[in-house]
UniProtKB/Swiss-Prot annotation:
CDD domains: Pancreat_lipase_like, PLAT_PL. Forms a 1:1 stoichiometric complex with (pro)colipase/CLPS. The gene is PNLIP. This is Pancreatic triacylglycerol lipase. Inhibited by bile salts, is reactivated by (pro)colipase/CLPS. Ca(2+) binds at residues 204, 207, 209, 212. It comes from Ictidomys tridecemlineatus. GO terms for molecular function: all-trans-retinyl-palmitate hydrolase, all-trans-retinol forming activity; lipoprotein lipase activity; metal ion binding; triacylglycerol lipase activity.
Length: 465
């Protein structure tokens, strides 16, 4: 294997080939596109005709059936494309296609909250091949998107700053290529678990990076190494804001079957996509849910996910927290730096949104061993019970914990406390909470008090102090 790798690198030192196309320019297999450690094989992208990039337009007026448009004034003007709206391109990844339901579903969620030109970019002609070839074909896709964006600018006076390109997997790097070719003029690029193989550790010219748009954000969901873990996504930061939900490696609800570990990356076909790539696909599912949950994906600046999980990164700072997904561009500090890392937790199935709270309970009553749980009641909803502490319960002691609720309760009105230990105790001990404070991610604290105690498995309601 080492010999093959060495030979490939030696071949990479040989003078490269180049192909040129009228509209899109020239493409070389020279370094860094080929012949480097991360992509040792000399491979050119296929022709534009073979890749066959298509633009499938959905709008608020045609939500169920796309209109295929091209960089042609009459074709665009006869469509439902509106120049007074933002335009969001969605680019699929390896093996996928533009007509796949998740792209149209993402558009439909957008139509619930905004008027928008939603363009699904289909390049299945170039995505359904070996991975190495597909990773080169995205250069053609990126060039086609850049050509389309430039056409909108020159022929229709449509500013690239009104363009948002969303790419999944290889589509993230196609978006980066489009951004590079438009000199960073595109308003926003979102990378949904940007593909790792042939891109992790490569020069910025090759992959998505912060210079590709005015604002670049990324969601990382499958960041384990491709060998031996078959993690398809990058762990490397690629944007101004990089989000690592659930740590960015293993997503709740995704249990990889052992058979998925032996599937070669050049042989994962459509039928095994969900089976083998659950973590990788979570990124676009999170983004889709975020569109209709504008406060449900608050993410926290933290040194690492382990520090976040140790409850050391709450609440949000005075400038607030960014929302992972659709509304990341509302964050005031979005371009204050590059490679800003943020962490959060999600649910294990849709709706994936969660709202984080910190609850502190000061105990009263008798000393026992057991568990204490709290549920929240607010003007927007009620939460289920969450465990705050288990162990020795001492009166006067305060115990704190953070949890991610599947309900945004809004402004807190009351809380309910319960304890249990499943131990038969003839003395029937009583435990209470003299005070409970609840802090939201915006830093607002609600305080509740009670002078009562209760027996095991009996609810105690605390009202505002």
């Amino acid at each position: 294997m080492l010999l093959v790798w060495s030979l490939a690198l030696l071949l990479g030192a040989v003078a490269g080939k180049e192909v040129c196309y009228d509209r899109l320019g020239c493409f070389s297999d020279d370094s860094p596109w080929s012949g480097i450690v991360e992509r040792p094989l000399k491979v050119l992208p296929w022709s534009p005709a073979d890749v066959n990039t298509r633009f499938l337009l959905y709008t608020n007026e045609n939500q169920d059936n796309y209109q295929q448009i091209t960089a042609d004034s009459s074709r665009i003007q006869s469509s439902n494309f509106k120049t007074n709206r933002k335009t969001r391109f969605i680019i699929h990844g390896f093996i996928d296609k533009g007509e796949e339901s998740w792209l149209a579903n993402m558009c439909k969620k957008m139509f619930q909250v905004e008027s928008v030109n939603c363009i699904c970019v289909d390049w299945k002609g170039g995505s359904r091949t070996g991975y190495t070839q597909a990773s080169q074909n995205i250069r053609i896709v990126g060039a086609e998107v850049a050509y389309f964006v430039d056409f909108l600018r020159t022929q229709l006076g449509y500013s690239p700053s009104n363009v948002h390109v969303i790419g999944h997997s290889l589509g993230s790097h196609a978006a980066g290529e489009a951004g590079r070719r438009t000199n960073g003029a595109i308003g926003r690029i979102t990378g949904l678990d940007p593909a790792e193989p042939c891109f992790e550790g490569t020069p910025e010219l090759v992959r998505l990076d912060p210079s590709d748009a005015q604002f670049v954000d990324a969601i990382h969901t499958d960041g384990a190494p491709i060998v031996p873990n078959l993690g398809f996504g990058m762990s490397q930061t690629v944007g101004h804001l990089d989000f690592f939900p659930n740590g960015g490696i293993e997503m709740p609800g995704c249990q990889k079957n052992i058979l998925s570990q032996i599937v070669d990356i050049d042989g994962i076909w459509e039928g095994t996509r969900d089976f083998a790539a659950c973590n990788h696909l979570r990124s676009y599912k999170y983004y889709t849910d975020s569109i209709v949950n504008p406060t449900g994906f608050a993410a926290f600046s933290c040194a690492s996910y382990s520090v976040f999980s140790a409850n050391k990164c709450f609440p949000c700072p005075s400038g607030g927290c960014p929302q992972m997904g659709h509304y990341a561009d509302r964050y005031s500090g979005k371009t204050n730096g590059v490679g800003q890392k943020f962490y959060l937790n999600t649910g294990d199935k849709s709706n994936f949104s969660r709202w984080r709270y910190k609850v502190s309970v000061t105990l009263s009553g008798q000393k026992v061993t057991g568990h204490i749980l709290v549920s929240l009641f607010g003007n927007a909803g009620n939460s289920k019970q969450y465990e705050i502490y288990k162990g020795s319960l001492h009166p006067g002691y305060t115990h704190s914990n953070e949890f991610d609720s599947d309900v945004d309760v809004g402004d807190l009105q009351r809380v309910k406390f319960i304890w249990y230990n499943n131990v038969i105790n003839p003395s029937l001990p009583r435990v209470g909470a003299s005070s409970i404070s609840v802090e939201r991610n915006d830093g607002r604290v609600f305080k509740f008090c009670s002078a009562e105690t209760v027996r095991e498995d009996v609810l105690l309601t605390l009202n505002a102090c």
